[in-house]
Amino acid sequence: MNMALISLAIDYKKSPIEVRSEFALSGLDVSMLYRSILAIDNVVHAVILSTCNRTEVYLEISNLRVVDDILVWWQGYVRNPNYKIKDYFKLRQGTEVIMHLMKLACGLESMVLGEPQILGQVKDSYTLSKKNHAIGKELDRVFQKVFATAKRVRSETRIGYCPVSVAFSAITLAKRQLDNISSKNVLIIGAGQTGELLFRHVTALAPKQIMLANRTIEKAQKITSVFRNASAHYLSELPQLIKKADIIIAAVNVLEYIVTCKYVGDKPRVFIDISIPQALDPKLGELEQNVYYCVDDINAVIEDNKDKRKYESSKAQKIIVKSLEEYLEKEKAIISNSAIKELFQKADGLVDLSLEKSLAKIRNGKDAEEIIKRFAYEIKKKVLHYPVVGMKEASKQGRSDCLVCMKRMFGLNVEK
């Protein structure tokens, strides 16, 4: 069966967050999703990726006309009928799918260029597909090459070390100041958009504990509810929370400092304030044991890293192009070897049947020389039957290129 590789995607480049939310497949029963998409005729294998910035479905299909059926399937999960998937989705095919997936896993397609979290999300999607028996050999080879490429990009470039967003830069600064973050407690003050983004970046680092403090605890609880080592708190609990914390990051709207020197003892801490107006007293940084960063410090890091990240991005692109070439060459070899194996099996089948008949006749006393001549004639006819039919058909259609190719295959003179 001839397979085609395609992907259908809705992402932040074309769709605002309210649209992405409507078409998101996260939060649904994963097994049910895979059962339903694999039940569509001509869908053979699938991997579903759904994050806050994109939802993408990677597929092996046996007929390109199935795209309309897949769109109908996806539309069925949309709550608001005013949103039509045909207005937002992007279709990729063949090599374009592999190139996109490589760039995606390396962070080159992310809203924050080079951010590392997407690779983990792609790996999780791949694992879920395997768990649901939804991935085939070709798609599996694609993802394995993608992961190897992402690993190479991370090891041979510094694209993940050059943060260009305030939240991501803040987390990067915290990582630089503290070794073994898995043993540290992190306090995030504020559960707004930036605070939530901070929280998600921190969870990817797997610290010992994450505490999220907010004026209204309901919002903090909503953000922390799905994470085992996370807890939600009122702002009034700050004095107790600060005592536990090794890293304190503030992203909250206040009119005066809510953390001052009176809250801290001799324990070394990293304070990062991305609030405007400032929420953490700058005098915290004057204490010898503390490290203090404000928005201006972070913006300086961002500006300094923009050019670096562009340079690292170009290096990553070259690695991806080379990796794609390697993958395609290997696939050609796999296809070629498969075709050669099938050709020999076909020949064996033709020879074995005729040979058995010929040997039986010889054993029954028939003229061996005559039988061997007949055997050779029959094999010649059988082996050349399909090539001759193909050459005649190519000639009828004016496909001189096919004729030349077949002549070369059989060692004939291509000039005639």
UniProtKB/Swiss-Prot annotation:
Disulfide bonds: none annotated. Coiled coil: none annotated. It comes from the Bacteria. It catalyses: (S)-4-amino-5-oxopentanoate + tRNA(Glu) + NADP(+) = L-glutamyl-tRNA(Glu) + NADPH + H(+). InterPro entries: 4pyrrol_synth_GluRdtase, 4pyrrol_synth_GluRdtase_dimer, 4pyrrol_synth_GluRdtase_N, GluRdtase_CS, GluRdtase_dimer_dom_sf, GluRdtase_N_sf, NAD(P)-bd_dom_sf, Shikm_DH/Glu-tRNA_Rdtase. It is an enzyme of class 1 (oxidoreductase). The keyword Mitochondrion does not apply. Pathway: Porphyrin-containing compound metabolism; protoporphyrin-IX biosynthesis; 5-aminolevulinate from L-glutamyl-tRNA(Glu): step 1/2. GO terms for biological process: protoporphyrinogen IX biosynthetic process from glutamate. Keywords: NADP, Oxidoreductase, Porphyrin biosynthesis. Its EC number is 1.2.1.70. Catalyzes the NADPH-dependent reduction of glutamyl-tRNA(Glu) to glutamate 1-semialdehyde (GSA). PANTHER family: GLUTAMYL-TRNA REDUCTASE. This is Glutamyl-tRNA reductase. It comes from Francisella tularensis subsp. holarctica (strain OSU18). The lineage of its organism: Bacteria, Pseudomonadati, Pseudomonadota, Gammaproteobacteria, Thiotrichales.
